[in-house]
Regions:
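Hydrophobic alpha-helical transmembrane segments and their immediately adjacent juxtamembrane loops
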Residues: 234-299
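Non-transmembrane, extramembrane segments of multi-pass ion/lipid transporters
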Residues: 178-179, 227, 248, 252
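Peripheral, non-transmembrane regulatory/ligand-interaction domains of membrane transport proteins
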Residues: 1-222, 231-244
Length: 299
């Protein structure tokens, strides 16, 4: 898929959306009118020159651009003079059951929001479509509300991933003692590893949401917007609690499975021991009479 930039412009009484393909020619992005909020969503943009050209009107620091071009960033929030920079991660399960991740970045200013995503997973596509179908829901809203919608979408995406994760946990739990030929231990280990990856992201993301909800020096978020952000923070806490419960279940399944395998092996060893005891006299007699002697005075 080709790189693209999706633009949404709105004010109290205007609304427009534009799409630009990011090829060799630099796109001519529409300039917002006075009083308009400008949301630019970048998908798969890896060209430093294109980013610098597009972000120049917003005064974005070169270190922020460097972070955006990076594929791996821990969730964090940084306060610059006229905008906030937020780094996050999202996950999705492939058809093969592999947990893949993608970087998401947000730059939130007074009258603009810039969002960045490497893979075209459609994280914010539904939000753009809802805006297009019902513009009244966003008309007149400030950038704080738009940023809340994006952050809430990120958290909602985690609920989808966690539901899939829990479904996999339940499936393995049901087949724990049934399918002896499958790679149960390998599946449990993958679930344990997935839980570690998700938790490693959700913990710092919790700190990001907490700062957004309580810090008074973030002038972009104030008043009613902090109420929405506290809701996002609460949802993040729910995710962590649910993930911890699922992780404990996975660890219990591993202990139970290993104990089951150990008991089964002990049972097999007992059977082999009984068989050995039964056949040992026969083996001794066969060994004695099978020796190459003409005369055996002892007998």
């Amino acid at each position: 898929p080709r790189s693209a930039i999706h633009q949404t412009l709105y004010s109290a009484d205007t609304f427009a959306q534009h799409d630009y393909l990011a090829g060799k020619k630099l796109p001519d992005i529409a300039r917002p009118q006075a009083g308009q909020t400008n949301w630019l969503h970048f998908v798969g943009i890896n060209d430093a020159a294109l980013l610098k050209y597009t972000l120049e009107p917003y005064g974005i620091h070169e270190l922020v651009i460097e972070d955006i071009l990076s594929r791996k960033q821990r969730p964090k929030i940084e306060d610059y003079d006229n905008y906030l920079f937020i780094a996050a991660q999202v996950y999705h399960y492939t058809a093969a059951g592999k947990l893949n991740s993608d970087q998401v970045y947000l730059i939130i200013g007074k009258d603009f929001v810039l969002s960045f995503q490497q893979k075209p997973l459609g994280l914010f596509s539904q939000l753009r479509r809802q805006m297009s179908e019902n513009p009244r829901g966003i008309l007149g809203k400030n950038t704080a509300f738009l940023a809340y919608c994006l952050l809430d979408r990120i958290v909602d995406d985690y609920f989808i991933v966690l539901e899939e994760y829990n479904n996999r946990v339940e499936a393995i739990d049901k087949s724990l003692f049934k399918d002896e030929n499958s790679d149960i231990l390998g599946k449990i280990h993958r679930l344990k590893r997935d839980a570690v990856r998700l938790r490693r992201t959700l913990l710092p993301l919790r700190d990001v949401f907490y700062q957004l909800a309580v810090r008074v020096d973030f002038t972009i978020f104030k008043g009613e917007s902090t109420v929405y952000l506290r809701d996002v923070y609460d949802h993040n806490m729910q995710l962590l609690e649910s993930l911890d419960a699922s992780r404990d279940m996975v660890l219990s399944m591993m202990d139970i499975y290993l104990s089951f395998q150990s008991n089964r092996m002990n049972q097999q060893m007992r059977v082999l021991t009984v068989i050995t005891i039964i056949f040992m006299p026969l083996t001794v007699i066969t060994g004695i009479y099978g020796m190459n002697f003409d005369n055996m005075p002892e007998l």
